[in-house]
A protein has these predicted regions:
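Central regulatory/effector-binding core of bacterial HTH transcription factors
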Residues: 67-119, 188
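Short amphipathic alpha-helical coupling segments at ligand-binding clamshell hinges
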Residues: 41-46, 81, 85, 170-171, ...
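Low-acidity, Ser/Thr- and Arg-rich intrinsically disordered low-complexity segments
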Residues: 3, 9-16, 29-35
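Secondary-structure junction motif
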Residues: 142-143, 156-178, 246, 262
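Beta-alpha-beta core module
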Residues: 98, 121-125, 129-131, 192-241
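Alpha-helical "hinge/linker" immediately C-terminal to small N-terminal DNA-binding modules
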Residues: 39-63
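Flexible hinge/capping segments at coil-to-helix
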Residues: 120-132, 136-158
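Short helix-loop capping/hinge motifs at secondary-structure junctions, enriched
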Residues: 118, 139-148, 229-231, 241-247
Length: 264
């Protein structure tokens, strides 16, 4: 790999850094073999690190030669909002492909949310914090008030958003101190169906306020603030791996700009 560095430096400083890192890691690994007792876990750990850097180096060289490549995205939250950014990015950069996964392993970028901004990983970037509200039909007795208490929610029939860790976390957190939990009337895994059921007055559900108002969902729905148990979620993105392509940096910038406009 060292022989490639002089050639690559003329084209891409980032590519040079990746290849240099791979070279250094390889030689450190070889030198360390003389100083430690070799164990299978030790070799396995370093092998994975070298393989990961090798893959990053290959992608860096490929990009320096004009290959747009793909962005491997782990999307665990805010799919409704991120899809808007993806649509615009793909329209402007049709040569770039995306692969979407729900697991971060092997991905370049993670988009997720946590209940507190303090829980965001150190190398992650906050995109937006939004309030969790209770979505009810406009015909609901409390719709005109804009507020509801945990006690008042106990008699409601909830529409559960299945297979969503963030929703389950909010639900459990709000009702964890209650002696009973509200009835689950329906369970679905589709935001559009959830909205239709709420608009028909068939139940209520917790929703992220900014995400909800930014989506094309039924208008005859009111959002109620939870007075005695306010909840929020913080959406963030986190680069994964040591290689970040120019296209990924552009996509990250567009993410930041899109969410910045939503916060206004």
């Amino acid at each position: 790999p060292g022989s490639l560095i002089p050639v690559i430096k003329r084209n891409s400083p980032i590519t040079s850094d990746i290849v240099t890192g791979l070279t250094n890691t390889f030689f450190i690994f070889i030198i360390s073999l003389r100083r430690v007792i070799i164990t299978i876990p030790y070799v396995h750990c370093n092998r994975l690190r070298i393989l990961a850097l090798s893959e990053d180096a290959a992608r860096a060289v490929s990009e320096s030669l004009g290959d747009a490549g793909e962005i491997r995205l782990c999307l665990r939250s805010s799919a409704v909002l991120v899809s808007n950014v993806l649509k615009d990015f793909i329209h402007e950069h049709p040569h770039v492909s995306f692969s979407i996964s729900s697991e971060p392993k092997g991905c370049d970028l993670l988009i997720d949310s946590v209940s507190s901004a303090y829980d965001i990983p150190d190398n992650a970037h906050l995109l937006m914090t939004e309030e969790i509200c209770l979505a009810v039909s406009s015909s609901h007795p409390l719709a005109h008030t804009g507020h509801i208490s945990v006690e008042q929610m106990m008699d409601e029939k909830f529409i559960d958003l299945a297979d969503t860790q963030s929703y389950a976390g909010v639900f459990n957190s709000i009702f964890c101190k209650c002696k009973k939990t509200p009835q689950i009337a329906y369970s679905c895994n589709d935001y559009i169906l959830q909205g239709k059921l709420i608009s028909l007055g068939l139940g209520v559900s917790f929703v992220a306020s900014v995400t909800w108002t930014s989506s094309s969902l039924p208008e005859n729905i009111s959002l109620l603030h939870i007075d005695d148990c306010p909840h929020f979620r913080s959406i963030y993105y986190q680069p994964l791996g040591s290689f970040c392509s120019e296209n990924q940096r552009i996509f990250e910038h567009q993410l930041e700009e899109y969410f910045k406009k939503l916060n206004k």
